[in-house]
Amino acid sequence: MNLSATEKDLMIVNMGPHHPSMHGVLRLIVTLDGEDVVDCEPILGYLHRGMEKIAENRTIIQYLPYVTRWDYLATMFTEAITVNGPEQLGNIQVPKRASYIRVIMLELSRIASHLLWLGPFMADIGAQTPFFYIFRERELVYDLFEAATGMRMMHNYFRIGGVAADLPYGWLDKCLDFCDYFLTGIVEYQKLITRNPIFLERVEGIGVIGGEEAINWGLSGPMLRASGIKWDLRKVDHYECYDEFDWEIQWQKEGDSLARYLVRISEMTESIKIIQQALEGIPGGPYENLEIRCFDRERDPEWNDFEYRFISIKPSPTFELPRQELYARMEAPKGELGIFLIGDQSGFPWRWKIRPPGFINLQILPQLVKRMKLADIMTILGSIDIIMGEVDR
């Protein structure tokens, strides 16, 4: 018996929310026509913790332990932007040695973030081996962090006017040894992945973003540079002491998932170049600006009040934010990480707006996956590189 062909029913599929160790608790409601994606709706908010409101009820020093929970795989950057804003508001000079230490820590954190992007990205498209390889190198980075800060993650190392502690004896030599070893590791990754025909089949020409389109969507970081736009805030804004080092902006013009992979792999090599130059040229001197203490509010406790009775308590620094507004930004591993800060002549910010790169970059996902195959969703989502801690805040 012959039946007339009728229009197929569309199928709605839920993807996620997954465990935070992968891309995080992101839920995608995907509408399918067979294997083809018709529509995709991201559902956010599963990891929302009210980070902006918490900032309005804490001093900057009290808030520092919270910020490491935004992007919990690149915590040095969230700490850096948290102290950079008040430093610019108060016109506080950072000692040269502290600036060099900051650059070293930021670039090590960039390498660790890119490594933990590479492993799950390869696992998403079916390659399990690199997922285990990247932990080998990442463990060495975390050993360096632990030796310098006491913590493998959530370091709480940056301070207004410098860093919390100087580098321990022998740390610079240990870091130089890591740089030499890691360059051979990147060569191994490129042999294993970059020219792999199965890998190229999965990523080449998938999720293409043009240069003008990337600018219109407000993309930043490797997402923008993979579309042919040479834009890196380390070169544009001249923050810390990046101008003193010889390095190049890494970019590609194809705009597909392969281009985003190549940009991040190349950025790790550039980070090693920056770290090596910083280690060889790091000056002596103080690691913090002691003049920051003059910003502390004078205490004149009355008899029988809390501060008088508990005279032995260690006071928290009360850096007062002047009545101004400021937007501070920096080049995080995932893109432009910024804060919009409004001071109100008190120790607490009146407004603390976070501009997370992952949240902005994620907005283009529904457009990229339309008319693609279902299996390509994980390739495109993985190439964007999101952490839901900073997306939901």
Swiss-Prot record:
Catalytic activity: a plastoquinone + NADH + (n+1) H(+)(in) = a plastoquinol + NAD(+) + n H(+)(out); a plastoquinone + NADPH + (n+1) H(+)(in) = a plastoquinol + NADP(+) + n H(+)(out)
SUPFAM superfamilies: HydB/Nqo4-like
Membrane topology according to the record: Peripheral membrane protein
Superkingdom: Eukaryota
Listed PROSITE patterns: COMPLEX1_49K
Gene3D superfamilies xref list: Cytochrome-c3 Hydrogenase, chain B
Main enzyme class: translocase
Major place of residence: plastid
GO biological process, one term: photosynthesis, light reaction
UniProt keywords, alphabetically: Chloroplast, Membrane, NAD, NADP, Plastid, Plastoquinone, Quinone, Thylakoid, Translocase, Transport
GO terms, molecular function: NAD binding; oxidoreductase activity, acting on NAD(P)H, quinone or similar compound as acceptor; quinone binding
GO cellular component, as recorded: chloroplast thylakoid membrane
Free-text function comment from the UniProt entry: NDH shuttles electrons from NAD(P)H:plastoquinone, via FMN and iron-sulfur (Fe-S) centers, to quinones in the photosynthetic chain and possibly in a chloroplast respiratory chain. The immediate electron acceptor for the enzyme in this species is believed to be plastoquinone. Couples the redox reaction to proton translocation, and thus conserves the redox energy in a proton gradient.
Assembly with partners or alone: NDH is composed of at least 16 different subunits, 5 of which are encoded in the nucleus.
Protein name: NAD(P)H-quinone oxidoreductase subunit H, chloroplastic
Native species: Gossypium barbadense
